């Protein structure tokens, strides 16, 4: 692999100052550097990757053992080596084929849990399951991290399909979050879902207790309007939640990969079991494509290789995710966790420190909002930010088709502007037409130059349906896997979240005045003194 890395770096240095636009002298450039899956088109032709770079990147994936590790993952091998676990979130959307963990086929249990979820959701949506004040009108999902970001993103994304109770999400331990969520709801017609695998997550359980007290202000049996997504049956029982409303999942489903199963309960309530199954089917379709398509035509592999080229080879530290779809407003935040918690590591699988950078910083906002915020830096800043645009051919509001046309035209315009830029000669001509001359024209022209030659990709699709969202989420999941394999890291643990938790527990008695700050650094001690409650 070392030789391939070196060859990639040498090639990148040789073509670093080449105009990407010049690559389109090849009339088949766009077609050759695009890949399709059904109605989905991934266009990566506006990058500086040429045939040589593409072939080297594909060789890199082969040398890293992506194909072998991919089959190990799907087969239930314990590829999460630091925790000794399989990685089988894919089984949640592929329940029609046996998958064995430690020699046991896990799919019958998955199908049973899925059927229990469907039955509960149908009862709730039909009104057979009622609150103590009538049919359930609102659902509040309490969770954090993977128990929040995925289902919250998906519920917003699939709002046109949401014909069930209103679903809201509480994650932050900041009391303002749960206060503002509950203040206009009726406890007697609200269901609260507590999503915590261990039922010990401090933020989630603090909010759950607050919700239970709120529920008790209107109903005689608060726990009767709670459901849980947890494997801790003893703790859910102690909380008062009946076992029929407790849905568990296995330790081989990581939190940030878990919305395909019980963590997606709120999503299933919102859109119904049939549309939820369409979401699963979309993910399963991407799984099949990922397993079967050759690397040169494989969307997750190519998305990963483009990302590796920009981050590891070109040295671009960030990646902007720019969905031109307001209902995908939460996608960048979801992908922040998916990618940065998975591949934000500094130690390789063998325990040695990495000799290269790990995953990039992922951020973004929906278009066109971002155009009036941070696109200034993307177009004219001194750092190059590779951009990933997402856009649908068709919206959900036929009476607002003219607005969707504006949306799509803006998306394509931004992608083209990043590629093409605007030269100083073009800027001068524009200013001259406005009547400027001489030194003032020259001064102003410099400010109106767009360097261009900034890479971007576009993921286009017909319409944001449940199946399409399933394909998109699975695409990014597998992208993370491929990047992690090539970087030599474990994408499925998250030890980086632990230290802060431990220190927070120690700081609580100090902030309450029950303990001194001995042993703390001067800054922390000063802040404790100032913020003491």
Swiss-Prot record:
This is Glucose-6-phosphate isomerase. Its EC number is 5.3.1.9. GO terms for biological process: gluconeogenesis; glucose 6-phosphate metabolic process; glycolytic process. Catalyzes the reversible isomerization of glucose-6-phosphate to fructose-6-phosphate. Keywords: Cytoplasm, Gluconeogenesis, Glycolysis, Isomerase. It is an enzyme of class 5 (isomerase). Pathway: Carbohydrate biosynthesis; gluconeogenesis; Carbohydrate degradation; glycolysis; D-glyceraldehyde 3-phosphate and glycerone phosphate from D-glucose: step 2/4. It comes from Cereibacter sphaeroides (strain KD131 / KCTC 12085). One of its GO terms (molecular function) is glucose-6-phosphate isomerase activity. The gene is pgi. It catalyses: alpha-D-glucose 6-phosphate = beta-D-fructose 6-phosphate.
């Amino acid at each position: 692999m070392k030789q391939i890395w070196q060859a990639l770096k040498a090639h990148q240095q040789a073509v670093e100052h080449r105009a990407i636009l010049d690559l389109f002298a090849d009339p088949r450039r766009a077609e050759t550097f695009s890949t399709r899956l059904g109605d989905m088109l991934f266009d990566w032709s506006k990058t500086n990757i040429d045939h040589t770079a593409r072939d080297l990147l594909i060789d890199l994936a082969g040398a890293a053992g992506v194909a072998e590790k991919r089959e190990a993952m799907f087969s239930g091998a314990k590829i999460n080596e630091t925790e000794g676990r399989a990685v089988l979130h894919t089984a949640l959307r592929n329940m029609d084929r046996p998958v064995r963990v430690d020699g046991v086929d896990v799919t019958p249990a998955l199908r049973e849990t899925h059927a229990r979820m469907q039955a509960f959701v149908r009862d709730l949506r039909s009104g057979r399951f009622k609150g103590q004040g009538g049919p359930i009108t609102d659902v509040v999902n309490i969770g954090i991290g993977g128990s929040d970001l995925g289902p919250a993103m998906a519920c917003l994304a699939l709002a046109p399909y949401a014909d069930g109770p209103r679903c809201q999400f509480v994650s932050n331990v900041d009391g303002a979050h749960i206060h503002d969520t509950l203040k206009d709801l009726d406890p007697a017609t609200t269901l609260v879902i507590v999503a915590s695998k261990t039922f010990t997550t401090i933020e989630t359980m603090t909010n759950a207790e607050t919700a239970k007290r709120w529920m008790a202000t209107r109903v005689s049996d608060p726990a009767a309007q709670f459901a849980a997504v947890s494997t801790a049956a003893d703790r859910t029982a102690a909380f008062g939640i009946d076992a029929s409303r407790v849905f568990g999942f296995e330790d081989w489903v990581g939190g940030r990969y878990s919305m395909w199963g019980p963590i997606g309960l709120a999503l299933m309530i919102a859109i119904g079991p049939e549309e939820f199954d369409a979401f699963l089917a979309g993910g399963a379709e991407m799984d099949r494509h990922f397993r079967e398509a050759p690397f040169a035509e494989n969307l997750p592999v190519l998305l990963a290789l483009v990302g590796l080229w920009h981050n590891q080879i070109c040295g671009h530290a960030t990646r902007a995710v720019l969905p031109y779809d307001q209902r995908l407003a939460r996608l960048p935040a979801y992908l922040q966790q998916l990618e940065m918690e998975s591949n934000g590591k500094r130690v390789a699988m063998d325990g040695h420190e990495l000799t290269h950078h790990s995953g990039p910083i992922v951020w973004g906002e929906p278009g066109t909002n971002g155009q009036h915020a941070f696109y200034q830096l993307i177009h004219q800043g001194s750092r190059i930010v590779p951009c990933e645009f997402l856009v649908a051919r068709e919206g959900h509001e036929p009476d607002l088709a003219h607005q969707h046309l504006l949306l799509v035209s803006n998306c394509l315009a931004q992608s083209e502007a990043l590629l093409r830029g605007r030269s100083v000669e073009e800027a001068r001509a524009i200013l001259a037409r406005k009547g400027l001359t001489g030194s003032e024209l020259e001064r102003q022209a410099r400010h109106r130059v767009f360097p261009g030659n900034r890479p971007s990709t576009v993921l286009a699709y017909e319409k944001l349906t449940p199946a399409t969202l399933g394909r998109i989420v699975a695409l990014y999941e597998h992208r993370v896997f491929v990047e992690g394999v090539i970087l030599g890291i474990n994408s499925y643990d998250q030890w980086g979240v632990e230290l802060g938790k431990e220190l927070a527990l120690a700081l609580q008695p100090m902030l309450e005045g029950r303990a001194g700050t001995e042993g703390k650094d001067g800054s922390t001690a000063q802040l404790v003194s100032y913020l003491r409650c």
